[in-house]
A protein has these predicted regions:
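Charged DNA-binding/catalytic regions of mobile-element recombinases
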Residues: 1-280
Length: 280
């Protein structure tokens, strides 16, 4: 649609303004009928039954994707409010100093961030896991886990996995400098880990002490991952959890919508970017 005001167009064409109107655009999902709300509710419940931690925005994205619908986000919210399906609002309390920098990057493979998190099991075991996530496309493309505490050697193996996942197993180093962002955990700051990162072409950077917000993308991922997958799962022992991890990471990459990606999953977003780059 032109950005020239309609009044100006009418003056140029020498016609009366009251006789000209913008052609209204049809809704992608058709006309709005409240009689169809029971069907919308059924589709919403098909999502929330398996994704009880999803708020209305992510439910809206999943319903439209799964059922190829074109519902407005506000309609999904109204139906969920009407039938008591809305999540209780979460209160986020900020502690420590604010992070004023920008973690996200304008393109993929400019900055990767990594972190370690723990999953306590009912048996008393604690599973340690580490991951690598791209600071642009949000894909978790490498991870490792063990029922023992992770070491610097595990992180160096994780670096190899990240390199091969993005650039192929024949690559000995990344084709261009990529920042490797982590906290100050001993696995990451060990001299051997720092030197190995440089060998691979990575540029290791760490967050300031007592400032986890500076690795906020990794922190946010851990919070989301635990809420959406770990909480309420079968956590009998480390072996049971380890058997589920691959499926959880795969679902996160292929299905979970991200607001930063226009409510697309990281796989959908990367596929679109690949199509765009190949068409140029």
């Amino acid at each position: 649609m032109t950005r020239v005001p309609l009044t100006v167009i009418c003056q140029v064409l020498q016609i009366a303004r009251r006789t000209a109107y913008y052609v209204s655009r049809a809704r992608p999902g058709g006309r709005y009928h409240r009689k169809a709300d029971p069907m919308v509710l059924e589709q919403i419940r098909a999502v929330t039954n398996s994704r009880a931690t999803y708020g209305y925005r992510r439910v809206w994205a999943m319903v439209n994707r799964t059922f190829r619908a074109g519902y407005n986000r506000k309609r999904i919210r109204r139906v969920m409010q009407l039938y008591g399906l809305m999540l209780a609002p979460r209160v986020h309390r900020r502690h420590g100093r604010p992070h004023l920098g920008r973690i996200e990057q304008p393109a993929s493979n400019q900055r990767w961030c990594s972190d370690v998190f723990l999953i306590p099991c009912w048996s008393g075991e604690v599973l340690s896991a580490a991951f690598v996530i791209d600071c642009h496309d949000r894909e978790v493309f490498a991870w490792t886990a063990s029922p023992r505490p992770l070491t610097g050697a595990d992180i160096r193996t994780l670096m190899d996995k990240a390199l091969w996942a993005r650039f192929g197993e024949r690559m000995l180093k990344v084709p261009h400098a990529i920042q490797w962002l982590s906290d100050n955990g001993p696995q990451y700051t060990a001299t051997a880990s720092v030197l190995y990162a440089h060998e691979l072409g990575l540029v290791p950077i760490t967050t300031p002490s007592y400032s986890p917000q500076s690795n906020g993308l990794a922190e946010a991922f851990v919070k989301t991952f635990k809420r959406d997958y770990v909480d309420g799962a079968e956590l009998r022992d480390a072996e049971t959890v380890l058997a589920q991890l691959s499926g959880w990471f795969d679902d996160y990459n292929t299905r979970a919508p991200h607001s930063a990606l226009g409510m697309r999953s990281s796989d959908e977003y990367r596929a679109e970017q690949l199509t765009l780059s190949s068409s140029r």
